[in-house]
């Protein structure tokens, strides 16, 4: 039987330069406090945790009013995270599994307000505000073994020229070592991808093909360098299908002048 020991305590730090410690230039200082109350043993922890972040500098913006709480074990965290910052307000509730072989995610996120321009995440538009509801039920370490579904609903994106809205967007993944499947369904377009090749190889193949057939989109020297180590999909095939419904609102939000006709279809077999 494992020997368990009670543990209880709190810690507080002010102006800790965590970015320097982790060698992450976009991450600055942090001020926070946290507490833990539970039991620990050899390879085991079961405790209630809570805390708050009064200051966190990231990407040139100072966040505040973040708090969290829940139950922490050696393999899971089940609880909530809330933000009430002027640029970021959200309510996260759910569970995350830390199993290194197959982590899982089961959560609901109410993204009440995210000012992407103020947080320096969108430098093109002076107005860039997003809100949405997100449900995720998935597992996997990477895209290659990702299985589950992510649903995004009640999306409102306000930018300089207009406001983009959608009621539902669904991403479904069914992936294993020998089979890849991704499906995206929305009011704007539906897309399906099937393959037996890992995604990294597929992405490299698509990029090298674009550099070959549309060289003006890429730096010539970099393209030649990558072409020397270009990959190919051997004894396999991949299929990408895209059916455009009404994509104009998305195109306007992504890039000025981008136009994709409603009803367009794309079928790629490679």
Describe the residue ranges of each PLM region.
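Interface amphipathic segments
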Residues: 1-133, 139-270
């Amino acid at each position: 039987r494992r020997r368990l020991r009670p543990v209880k305590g709190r810690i507080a730090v002010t102006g800790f330069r965590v970015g320097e410690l982790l060698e992450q230039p976009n991450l600055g200082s942090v001020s926070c406090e946290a507490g833990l109350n539970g039991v620990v043993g050899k390879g085991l922890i079961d405790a209630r945790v809570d805390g708050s972040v009064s200051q966190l500098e990231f990407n040139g913006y100072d966040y505040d009013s973040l708090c969290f709480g829940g139950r922490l074990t050696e393999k899971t965290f089940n609880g909530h995270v809330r933000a009430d910052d002027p640029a970021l307000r959200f309510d996260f509730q759910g569970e995350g599994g830390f199993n290194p072989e197959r982590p899982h995610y089961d959560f609901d996120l109410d993204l009440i307000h995210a000012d992407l321009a103020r947080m320096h995440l969108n430098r093109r538009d002076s107005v860039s505000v997003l809100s949405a509801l997100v449900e995720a039920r998935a597992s996997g370490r990477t895209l290659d073994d990702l299985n589950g579904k992510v649903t995004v609903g009640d999306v409102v994106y306000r930018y300089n020229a207009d406001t983009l809205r959608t009621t539902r967007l669904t991403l479904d993944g069914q992936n294993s070592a020998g089979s890849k499947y991704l499906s995206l369904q929305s009011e704007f377009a539906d897309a399906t991808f099937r393959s037996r090749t890992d995604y990294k190889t597929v992405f490299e193949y698509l990029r090298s093909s674009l550099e070959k057939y549309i060289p003006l989109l890429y730096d010539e020297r970099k393209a030649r360098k990558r072409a020397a180590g270009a990959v190919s999909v051997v004894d396999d095939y991949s299929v990408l299908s895209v059916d455009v419904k009404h994509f104009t609102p998305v195109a306007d939000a992504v890039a000025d002048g981008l136009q994709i006709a409603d009803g367009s279809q794309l079928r790629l077999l490679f």
